[in-house]
């Protein structure tokens, strides 16, 4: 128990730098995304929330997550967990708790490559066999606090109890945001 408390205390100390607040929006042909985060763009602990809507069939995903960012030079590694509400249209409405991580590689001229993936097996969901989401792309920050993004997002489920597996979100997007 003491080791856990000491370890958690060290993580808090390592992440005690100023935490930036970010607001982002993404749009694709069939998807709208709104995202708010605290501490996601710097090393240490972070929290974020996200709402994703497939504008074609009305599927919605609402998420809140937390995790830890580890900066190693120009690379930031992320490990995290989310609580996600899946508002599917094929009888798969429910909750999932995906676990995953990501990587961001800072490049010259304020460009960056990023990617992340999260998965929740049947034990961490109540309505589907598996929930998977992935997101990756390129970002550019021409001036602080503006960030512009181009990427690809996927989210899908494997059905359970006779319901078919299907794709919830799938496609390229453009986006932008502000980080204060």
State what each model feature region is.
Residues 38-40, 68-70, 103-105, 140, ...:
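Residue-level signature of outer-membrane beta-barrel architecture
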Residues 42-47, 72-79, 109-115, 140, ...:
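Repeated loop/turn-to-beta-strand initiation elements of outer-membrane beta-barrel proteins
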Residues 30-34, 41-43, 58-64, 75, ...:
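Residues that define the transmembrane beta-barrel architecture of outer-membrane proteins
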Residues 1-22:
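Cleavable N-terminal export/targeting peptides
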Residues 18-68, 175:
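Short glycine/proline- and aromatic-enriched beta-strand/turn motifs that initiate or cap beta-hairpins
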Residues 53-57, 72, 85-91, 121-125, ...:
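Gram-negative outer-membrane beta-barrel proteins
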Residues 23-29, 47-53, 79-85, 101, ...:
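Transmembrane beta-barrel strands of outer-membrane/channel proteins
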Residues 138-142, 167-180:
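Outer-membrane beta-barrel "beta-signal"
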């Amino acid at each position: 128990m003491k080791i856990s408390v000491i370890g958690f205390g060290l993580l808090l100390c390592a992440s005690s730098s100023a935490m930036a607040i970010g607001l982002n929006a993404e749009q694709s042909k069939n998807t709208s995304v709104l995202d708010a985060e605290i501490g996601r763009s710097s090393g240490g602990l972070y929290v974020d929330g996200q709402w994703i809507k497939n504008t074609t069939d009305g599927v919605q995903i609402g998420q809140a997550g937390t995790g830890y960012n580890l900066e190693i030079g120009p690379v930031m590694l992320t490990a995290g967990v989310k609580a996600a509400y899946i508002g599917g249209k094929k009888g798969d409405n429910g909750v999932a708790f995906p676990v995953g991580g990501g990587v961001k590689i800072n490049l010259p001229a304020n460009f960056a490559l990023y990617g992340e993936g999260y998965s929740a097996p049947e034990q961490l969901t109540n309505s589907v066999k598996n929930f998977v989401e992935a997101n990756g792309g390129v970002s550019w920050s021409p001036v602080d606090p503006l960030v512009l993004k181009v990427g690809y997002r996927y989210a899908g489920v494997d059905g359970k109890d006779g319901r078919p597996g299907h794709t919830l979100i799938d496609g390229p997007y453009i986006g932008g945001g502000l980080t204060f």
